[in-house]
Amino acid sequence: MTSFGTPGGRITPTGSQRTVPGGKWSITEGDAQAIVTEARKAFFVMAGVLAVLWVIQIANWADSYHLTLNYGIVPRDIGRLPDIFTAPFLHFSWGHIEGNSGPLFIFGFLAAYRGVKKFFAVTLLVIMTSGLAAWLFEPANTVGAGASGVVFGYFGYIMVRGFFDRHVIDMVIGAIMALCFAYQFTVLLPHAGIGWQAHIGGLVGGIAAGWIFRDKRPRASGKTASAVTAARPVAGGTVPTRVDLPKKPGATGMQ
């Protein structure tokens, strides 16, 4: 957000007839198919979000950015508090929206590819936390706007989601994103004309979202997963690798 002064983790195949132990850290074939489906949805959702942002930007530019001035965040103005929900869609210049569009699409897609419904809940939370941080702590007589607070929210969510959901792939993605975009943390420090308060608020909201919206579904453990009985071919047929021993008449247990 920018402010301006105002005047276990291996893939284990499963099917209808068998379950392979993988524990809480495994990803089943069904999970993988669901991820692919949700990833397609995530791509189109983020493409739609960017399209909306750029349409708003064109209208805003044509109106000399009065939309930003009228619907951006004005710190500690009670009457402007609802503007925390409109400010992320508004920018101050073409360079401003261009700088936010790439990270917004990448982080938004990664935040959404495991479930678009959950993504919308995460988005609402980080909009509120980043907007409230800007409204409470940014300097007086300024207007704050821009999607960067939401970007930092997605960033925080992606970094911790894998740990809370216990998905190794998400943990790897979070680590890679943290390493590749570590320079972004410099924007959390105070800079003139930069709404770093919104960035911190978004980051905190994203981390909180990772915990609040973590996957609470029970996952099969290696101790409870059913065993797979295999058969190996031999001349004349197959010999099972496990058989039941016949009991003697009258036997009541192991001899």
Identify the role of each PLM range.
Residues 2-250:
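A detector for small-residue-rich transmembrane helices and their helix-helix packing motifs
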